[in-house]
């Protein structure tokens, strides 16, 4: 088992929700990111034409599953579920400290909206709201994890999977985003 230690730092605010819908550092979004980038690495090693069944089987054996109907153990006995061989831990699951939002000075117009609104409202629609009668967006509820916050990230994984895991981690470092509105650049981290 190989163990690696990293520091994760957000470059843009992140909306990672706890059960109470407040911003909180949580490991599951980062594990989901690792799985997603692992799929990209798997596809790349198969000339971007992988057999999806083979990919899902390999993913399930590495990251755990409850869906593979054809999985067997070392003795050939059927395995209905398998736990992950990848272990992950965040240094802390602290709540976000960002409790207010400074609205952008830039305004945009849209044919379906009567007045020009702050441009960040479009990028953050959902986590950001526009209160009735206001021109400036506010955070919906709870706190967000603000840009610049960081925590320690520990990862343990089988040595034989190190090349693909480390390539996936490199892709996460370059392109990773997590949380609400991450497709719009929120939750960008290295």
Task: State what each model feature region is.
Residues 1-190:
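Small/polar/charged residue-enriched interaction surfaces, especially the RNA/DNA-contacting tracks
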């Amino acid at each position: 088992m190989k163990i690696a230690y990293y520091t994760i730092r957000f470059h843009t605010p992140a909306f990672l929700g706890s059960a109470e819908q407040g911003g909180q550092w949580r490991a599951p979004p980062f594990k989901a990111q690792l799985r997603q980038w692992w799929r990209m690495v798997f596809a790349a090693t198969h000339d971007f034409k992988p057999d999806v069944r083979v990919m899902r089987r390999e993913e399930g054996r590495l990251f755990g599953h409850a869906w593979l109907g054809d999985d067997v153990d070392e003795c050939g006995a059927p395995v209905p579920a398998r736990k992950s061989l990848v272990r992950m831990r965040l240094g802390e699951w602290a709540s976000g400290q960002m409790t207010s939002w400074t609205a952008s000075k830039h305004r945009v117009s849209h044919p379906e909206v009567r007045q020009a609104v702050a441009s960040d409202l479009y990028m953050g629609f959902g986590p950001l709201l526009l209160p009735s009668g206001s021109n400036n967006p506010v955070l919906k509820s709870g706190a967000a994890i603000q840009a610049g916050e960081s925590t320690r990230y520990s990862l343990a994984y089988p040595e034989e999977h190190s090349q693909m895991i480390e390539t996936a981690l490199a892709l996460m470092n370059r392109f990773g985003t997590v949380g609400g509105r991450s497709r719009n650049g929120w939750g960008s981290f290295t």
